[in-house]
Amino acid sequence: MSYRYGHEVLEVRSEALRGNPLGDPHVRELHVLVPEVEGTHPAIWVLGGYSGTPGNLLADDPWSEGLLRRVNRLASEGKLEPAIFVLPDCFTSLGGSQYLDSPATGLYERYLWDDCRSAVEARWSCGKHGVAGKSSGGFGAILNAVRHPEHVRAVACHAGDMAFEYCYLGHFPALAEALRRYGGVEPFVEAFRAAKKKRSGEWFDPIQTLCMAACYSPDERAPMGIGLPFDPKTLELRDELWERWLAVDPVRLVEDPRHAATLGGLNLLFIDAGTRDEYHLQWGARRLASRLRALGIPHEHEEFDDSHSGTSYRYDVSLPKLSAALRR
């Protein structure tokens, strides 16, 4: 069956994000790609990586397809069963939210499953829901699957953040140096917000790590409510806060019998990573796959010869799998 997708934009006035601690907008655009086929279709949520937005996912360039062009091509080739693709905006002024609720950033899980889901289901007839994402979005896909099994029935995790000691620890020194240079968390964030070139090496690594701390180890006693998992003077780990990071690491989540049972009940659990990932996420994917095998949890694990960036072509593999699995 050959068909095409339309692109619609909803305005979501989020009660979950109203009054969030960063002062970020609570009124957001929700981009939805809708198949021009009547009937009830599964909903596939596509979560961008750190610093990403729906605009990034949709953007075309001469050498890479945006998501709308990609799903139209897959549909025309007969590779994609009709599905509704939902692209939520979970960006924050620190660069992201990790798609979870945190008192330091805002209630982004609640935003997804209360505000955005309600808006989509009020407009279209939706079947089962699945989540796909890359990098931080891949992490968010797994986290939301185990925390919201009432909604999520299938997952595709592309180079998702996991095995945190490999993907995060190496970035702690850059944040510690930035805090020393600017005099603490609040002055650093003020300087970052004033910077004209925010994606430069001077800013990107430290603000990304600070954002992770805001998501994983919020602390109301700390500046901006962000608990640092290390001593900024010595880089010595603060075990209590670092353990809070590890508590949401997917390779640890699967050790919880409740989460293992949830993952085992999914219609699809697809995991991949490039063999040359700069954040070492292939190792986390291997560890997760090994633990899933040991627990007898059905999953698909693939590797491919590439690095971390510029791998959106892997959605050619996962989206057809998701759209088929969610119809079972």
What are these regions, as identified by a protein language model?
Residues 1-328:
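Non-catalytic cap/lid and distal C-terminal segments of serine-dependent acyl enzymes
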